[in-house]
């Protein structure tokens, strides 16, 4: 009888030991789970819900959770995604996976980038998982401003256990074309100006050295300049055509926000173009945020009305393309 009781006691102790072992392992697993990884910080922020959806669709959330990093996430706000055509989480979840993957990976840097520690310079090149981005660190009045591809950083250096998060006011688009001339040729709305570029050879392989910014007149604007079709471009005087084209190009990479940062208290500045002549740049006040600016207008030496940007900040491997609603005129 005593041996029977002893057997029961041994059995009970064994089961107790097993339960304690599993309890310890469960507690250990719970303790080791890191809920402060960059993807989980994103998931906990209600203002970054669409970007969180992009990470999930692209499976980048799993990689960021497993990875030691460090990573820097360039997270557009929900408002930024709304402006880019993704107003809700559902709209992102219903997008094609390949497009979402491009968006997500273009907003991820391998490494820890405290952008506020960059030199005070314009358009410093950084490499994301889907291509280059250009960071500007500058002082405007009393504010120190950070931008990426012309998108302003709203909140910087949000900490996570395996990296940092920078919150942007705009979704950045991965560039498709290495050459700005290819981006011009690909847009049907500027096909007449594209033919002028081709005929003059100004952005050809031989002449295209360094970065360029192009303010390309749309087809309606080219019509007002006397070019109703590509045939008119072919028949035009070549020297006159070169003057026209050069007055729409500058030798530098310039996003719209670069002008906002570099323009002084008068809210007006001048931009020297490829032909040596200048274009007036005027800042457009942001009516919903007094003291800030929403964009720019241009005016050539011969323009009597402001030239407006229809599309802006189209990044290529060697420059930036903007599309304008009027041609820049040298004379009236």
Predicted regions and their residues:
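Mature, structured domains of secreted/extracytosolic soluble proteins
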Residues: 2-6, 11, 24-332
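Processing junctions and N-termini across compartments
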Residues: 17-18
